[in-house]
Amino acid sequence: MTNPMQFPDGFVFGGATAAYQVEGETRTHGKGKVPWDDFLAAQGRFSPDPASDFYNKYPVDIDLCQRFGINGIRVSIAWSRIFPSGTGEINPEGVAFYHELFATCNNAGVIPYVTLDHFDTPEAFYQNGGEGFLTRTTIDAFVEYAKFCFAEFTEVKHWFTFNEIPATAEGSFIVGNWPHGEKYRLDKAFQLMHNMMVAHAKAVVAFHEGGFEGEIGIVQNLEPKYPLAPNNAADCEAARMADVINNRWVLDATFRGHYAADTMEAATKLAHIAGGELDVRDEDIAALTAALPYNDCLGVNTYKCQFLRAAEGENDINHNGTGDKGSSRWFLKGVGESCVREGVPTTDWDWIIYPEGLYDLLLRIKNDYPNYKKIYITENGMGYKDDFEDGFIDDAPRIDYMRQHLAWILKAIDGGVNVDGYFVWSLQDQFSWTNGYNKRYGLFYIDFETQKRYPKASAYWYKNVAETGLLMA
């Protein structure tokens, strides 16, 4: 019998990044604009430059990976660094940068897992009446961009199309705190997710028809939804509706190739409450179905869960982007209210810490979508206000958070779920889309004034796990 504290041979112990959150150089070296550029400048709260200065410092970070036993790294390609206008003219400096980055990774034995679009779709697709992926021509543009990358960067063997489609929809059309955002537009949220899933499916088919070596999948932020009172039918319905928004819509599209009848019914109901309709076409379903055999892997980003209770009233959502504990609110018409179950801890940003939820989620994927092939935990970590004292960062709560989640991953593996790797979010401290720089996730502390890196206690702990393949209690 396998030791329950032993990870399988070949398990990937990685660290995760994203282009806009680490690279810096957002308007240099030929890079085109993305919506976040003007949006953040108008806010004036924080800037994505220089972030972690990964554009210039990536050799330092890859060396840290090598020294600390990290054998995989999630990176993303900035679409507008390759195609500054989204389509058309190619920026050779951007192409050269990513070749150099991938070569450095591969030569160090730190295998790159590459995402094509991590929240930074080019601004060009929002001009002249465009609405990003709500405009269907963007689907075709993405597929052409993906095909270029597959053919150009053949040194990459692990591809993901998108990062966190539900989060993109939530920020854009539910919470509305992203560029070009609107609040409580569930109709647009579902439509955006659908169109992006069609783009994913077409890119997956293109990858396999092109005969490229390697694997391809998608990364989703999946979040277990629980009724606050499990024996209350109304609370159970609230949890079900929230699950459709965050999980079932994208999982059905990926692994069914269509939307189950009750999934579509729930989405249509929520779209009608928001005053809109969904445009799901026969050719869209054909595209989803065509990709079914070719979804090689699923990336699961997991941080928290949600407890829901039934409630009547108007929409009221407040995003906690400051770390002022207790300031978040989540009430969505047609769904219900987000609550905290007694005895369950939360972070300063009101994220519920419930590691057992990851086990429930993984078993649910295995049971409900048995045609899945493999899962990577592509993000998991804890945002924390790290204290920097004499060059040492004692982030014991982060270690405990990671240990608990890894233990539940091992239990899921023992239960028959095929999990092939874990990528901690994040490799180094990074720029956060809605929190700036005070919410730190990294294994390596960055002094953003000097860009010097300092390993945290969690980095040494993770090094031991990665190098031994053992999770110690």
Regions found by a protein language model. Give the residues of each.
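Active-site-adjacent substrate/metal-binding segments within catalytic domains
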Residues: 23-98
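Active-site region of glycoside hydrolase catalytic domains
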Residues: 2-42, 85-87, 95-473
